[in-house]
């Protein structure tokens, strides 16, 4: 049997901090579907930002250029690529793969949250607009 992965070790070390986040008072303030919609309409940008930070780390810690050459610390490369794999292409219920961001956006649609702002933001990025 294979040993515990670096990602699993990281998750275990972060378990107490994750518990603090999950128990944050903001979640207790979400009492209605409308509360959830409003929360998600803002929180979706944090989900997007996390993915952007993750991809920046991947770019800085690994080689994403052509031609490829080994770059960075081996364990760091493995850890960041494991996280990217899970965040960018997690297994979807019923088969297939989906990013956590896309999953969150789909949940927003399902609960009736307004996705127009995040969709406009993404479209502006696709067109190359600077967000500064």
Report each predicted region and the residues it spans:
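Non-heme di-metal
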Residues: 2-132
């Amino acid at each position: 049997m294979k040993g515990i992965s670096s990602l699993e070790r990281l998750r275990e070390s972060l378990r107490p901090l994750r518990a603090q986040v999950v128990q944050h008072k903001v979640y207790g303030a979400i009492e209605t579907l409308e509360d959830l919609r409003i929360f998600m309409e803002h929180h979706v940008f944090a989900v997007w930002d996390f993915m952007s930070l993750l991809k920046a780390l991947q770019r800085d810690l690994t080689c994403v250029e052509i031609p490829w050459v080994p770059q960075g610390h081996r364990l760091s490369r493995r850890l960041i690529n494991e996280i990217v794999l899970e965040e960018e292409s997690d297994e979807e219920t019923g088969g297939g793969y989906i990013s956590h961001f896309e999953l969150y956006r789909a949940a927003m649609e399902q609960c009736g949250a307004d996705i127009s702002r995040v969709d406009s933001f993404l479209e502006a990025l696709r067109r190359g607009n600077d967000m500064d």
